[in-house]
């Protein structure tokens, strides 16, 4: 991977408000002089992977997780996908925000779209040997969330490797109207 030491990776779920919240967050990060790698529509686990994979200084998933549709927020991780908490930087961020003393950067950050899930799928499939699998029927239900496209890539790769798995797909198309 291309190292991105001065970058934040960001992705978002399928909620109707996620894309606009992600765009606003990206603009703020760029204005602060930090580069952004936009992963597109992702699950939180993809942001965690990309933060480490691209050697970014942090990651953000725009999501409200299991909360109702009218909620939204930001899940933050530090470098190497380490959790961020009051003890590990969140209190510092709060203090800076409350004081309003922001640094003016020498230049605006740079934006890059990297919505290719290949490295993530390679990582996941690196844990198994498709040829060693026994015949299996698997029902996969991503609940119309952001995992559907990633699961499509996984099933395609396993089928191309002649893995003896039959996939039954339910609720596969991303749909933010839950």
Language-model segments: residues:
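An N-terminal, well-structured beta->alpha segment
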Residues: 1-27, 31-32, 110-137
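Gly/Ser/Thr-enriched, mixed-charge loops and adjacent short helices
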Residues: 72-178
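N-terminal small/polar loop signature for handling phosphorylated ligands or for N-terminal nucleophile
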Residues: 4-71, 153-178
């Amino acid at each position: 991977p291309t190292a991105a030491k001065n970058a934040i990776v960001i992705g978002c779920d399928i909620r109707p408000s996620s894309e606009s919240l992600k765009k606003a967050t990206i603009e703020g990060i760029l204005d602060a002089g930090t580069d952004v790698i936009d992963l597109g529509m992702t699950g939180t686990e993809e942001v965690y992977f990309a933060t480490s994979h691209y050697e970014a200084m942090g990651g953000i998933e725009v999501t409200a997780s299991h909360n109702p549709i009218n909620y939204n927020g930001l899940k933050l991780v530090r470098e190497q996908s380490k959790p961020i908490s009051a003890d590990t930087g969140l209190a510092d961020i709060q203090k800076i925000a409350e004081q309003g003393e922001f640094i003016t950067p020498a230049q605006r950050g740079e934006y890059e779209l990297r919505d290719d899930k290949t490295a993530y799928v390679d990582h996941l499939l690196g844990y198994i040997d498709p040829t060693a699998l026994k015949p299996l029927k698997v029902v996969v239900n991503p609940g119309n969330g952001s995992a559907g496209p990633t699961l499509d890539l996984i099933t395609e790769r396993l089928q191309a490797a002649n893995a003896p798995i039959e996939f039954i797909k339910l609720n596969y198309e991303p749909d933010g109207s839950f």
